A protein has these predicted regions:
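Alpha-helical membrane-anchoring segments
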Residues: 1-550
Length: 550
């Protein structure tokens, strides 16, 4: 169970505290205890990860000679086993059983929401082209539901085949983009930049192993590029401090410059961040030149294991365990088991054009102009440099969200089903601290008084945009563009907030060649009230709990 809350979280006492007090208490507690998830939460994800692996083994058994646990070494690097791993992962993710599910994915009950949301007519969605005939509405139609159901069935159909043929892949490759036209959230949930790209390689490549190597190398390389901003230095101590396996209070404090007064990343934390960036570049740039078994392969694989092993060992929120395990398996299959397959054996001009676009052009634009591309499509994983939003509801107006068709309410309401009001407040403080500790999150204190007419937490309730997207869209994964003006408009269409009842602070990511963050203050009824840019150097000088101009 979550430990009994501190006296500060007494319901009456907590309601009287302002932004500075809440963040100060929350950040101090976060550094020493993290978010404070109970052991049961981690056991839930351990079981889920085991079922992910066993599910893959189960579908491999449909292929003669595969899927036997006793002699798994004889088939684990079979081509069909690899294809089924990515088809299975695609099914798991597009149904919401993978990342951002369960307690570490900010879902208490129900722990899985995506498929419940995507299969229900009338739920909120974000069409890629608003107003597009048949698919461009803000609420889900029977056509949207039918397309999504067909995608799920197509993935299942491919998984139960003895061998994967083009006829099994064509429906998947056609249906996911069609689903995305109606709701771009589904494309992100299906990991369009990774799992879908691999499936396209299975379908179009003369040698799909060569093509898949390019996809996996790009995943690591662009992840490394995304770390070349000041924001990543803040990610490592925040992620590490939330590790329940890290028991040493002294080591937790050493992650920050001077706990509890200066919570910028320490020299130790920055060194860890630089090491992580090195690994994300070193892994692909080493494996790029592997042509046979030998020292270069062993060094490259060591970099992969260190990189993903560090992420997994921190038991991070967002529940990205399946994706990290899949990436490790992909490294072993593509490079250790098939080192002699040349990267230049793709053998398909259309696929080469596709790979250039999705592995080079899109990530490049996403790093240069992050407002135009999802951080997932730009492969900017774990960078801490993401768009995000703060939704501010006046005088309980969040109750209007009940007008939406949803698979789950807001996170706070879910917490209160299992915890006391004081315990729920303590968890809330942890989530607020998590946001405020990030460099981008320090915009919150800067803009909060302006967005709330000087009355933060007295008249307004703060809800992170992640929690709103999770409830309103059924899926979220750190993608701030899912909770910006498009979702505000879709929610306003159904909930009809009066002027001042819902204000949203929207913050964009830092362009890799820039030094500012673009922000907007939006009223759901009136539109954009104010916008501007915040200098990263100014944000770095702010304390997480500073409120207003510091």
């Amino acid at each position: 169970m979550i430990p009994e809350p501190l006296a500060e979280f007494d319901t009456d006492e907590w309601s009287k505290k302002d932004f500075t007090e809440r963040v100060r208490i929350g950040t101090n507690l976060y550094v020493l205890k993290g978010l404070g998830y109970p052991l049961a939460a981690y056991l839930f994800h351990a079981v889920k990860l085991s079922l992910f692996v066993l599910g893959w083994v189960f579908f491999c058994r449909f292929t003669p000679g595969l899927g036997t646990l006793r002699d798994f070494r004889s088939w684990i690097f079979d081509g069909t086993a690899f294809q089924k791993a990515f088809l299975w992962a695609s099914l798991v993710e597009v149904m919401g059983f993978g990342c951002m599910s369960g307690p570490l994915g900010l879902r208490m009950w129900p722990p899985f929401t995506a498929f419940l949301h995507f299969l229900r007519p009338g739920t909120t969605k974000l069409p890629l082209v608003r107003g597009l005939p048949l698919l461009g509405t803000n609420t889900r139609t029977m056509l949207d539901v039918a397309l999504y159901a067909a995608l799920v069935v197509s993935l299942l159909r491919a998984l139960v085949q003895p061998a994967i043929a083009a006829s099994h892949l064509v429906p998947i490759v056609a249906l996911l983009p069609l689903c995305a036209l109606g709701d771009g959230t589904i494309a992100l949930a299906g990991r369009f930049e990774h799992h879908f790209a691999m499936i396209v390689c299975f379908l179009l490549a003369g040698n799909w192993i060569a093509a898949c190597k390019w996809v996996q190398l790009a995943i690591w390389f662009w992840a490394g590029v995304s770390k070349l901003t000041v924001a990543f230095g803040y990610v490592v101590p925040i992620m590490t401090a939330n590790n329940p396996l890290l028991k040493s209070a002294a080591l937790r404090r050493r992650l920050f410059v001077s706990y509890p007064d200066d919570l910028r990343p320490s020299r130790l934390a920055k060194t860890m961040a630089h090491a992580g960036t090195f690994l994300e570049f070193a892994a692909p740039l080493t494996l790029l030149f592997v042509t046979h078994h030998g020292p270069l392969l062993y060094v490259g694989m060591s970099f992969v294991l260190l990189l993903h092993g560090f992420i997994l060992s921190n038991l991070p929120i967002a529940a990205v365990f399946e994706w990290n395990i899949l990436s490790i398996y992909a490294a072993f299959f593509l490079f250790a088991a098939h080192p002699t397959v040349s990267l230049f054996a793709v053998g398909s001009v259309p696929l080469t054009v596709y790979l250039v676009v999705v592995l080079l052009v899109v990530p490049l634009i996403g790093n240069l102009v992050p407002s135009k591309v999802s951080f997932l499509l730009a492969m900017r994983y774990y960078a801490g440099n993401w768009a995000w939003n703060a939704w501010l509801f006046r005088r309980g107006s969040q109750r209007k969200l009940a007008r939406l068709k949803r698979a789950a309410p807001l996170l706070r309401e879910q917490l209160e089903r299992f915890l006391s009001a004081e315990q729920a407040a303590q968890m809330d403080a942890g989530f607020l601290a998590f946001r405020a500790l990030h460099l981008q999150g320090r915009v919150l204190g800067l803009l909060l008084p302006r967005a709330t007419d000087g009355n933060p937490f007295r008249e307004y309730t703060y809800v992170d945009g992640e929690a709103v997207a999770a409830s309103a869209l059924g899926w979220n994964f750190g993608e701030g563009h899912l909770a910006d003006e498009r979702l505000i408009a879709a929610v306003q269409e159904q909930c009809d907030f009066e002027e001042g009842e819902l204000r949203v602070i929207c913050v964009e990511a830092q362009p890799i060649l820039g030094s500012t963050l673009h922000w907007r203050i939006v009223d759901a009824n009136r539109g954009v009230l104010e916008e501007g840019h915040a200098q990263l150097s100014d944000l770095a000088r702010r304390k997480p709990w500073d409120c207003g101009e510091a």
